[in-house]
């Protein structure tokens, strides 16, 4: 049996696939980075499992996370999403998705890509942490606090240091797979 991080819910195939195929792998595609940022914002106050279970519905609701399409969504379109039972119907999070798309586009214009901007915070290299037990890992770090402040300054919403650390881990900038997880070395 393969050894995974202790946080993986082994009774949920979406969770297992997310850990095995996505979490912690260095991500450099701007559209994928945007989708992941949105998913992390939806998680605030909820379980990651809830977000994963609604992921496809979010894609459908937000134009497959095509940046310009999301940035151009009208208030009426966003309000209509509040009636969609397939997604998390939190008004602030729904409207934050559009605001984050607009801020994301501004970062792309300034840096050439969001990828260039984001990875500059780790000098282009994944930080590999010593994590014997993920439950003992910090909820935020100096890096996540620094990036959070910069994102907020640029107009991003729901990007506090805890959500940002989760984003950095998921996007592979920080490798926090547990030391005995078989995926730790695959992402170094």
What does each of the following model-derived ranges do?
Residues 1-188:
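HhH-family (HhH-GPD) DNA N-glycosylase catalytic core used in base-excision repair
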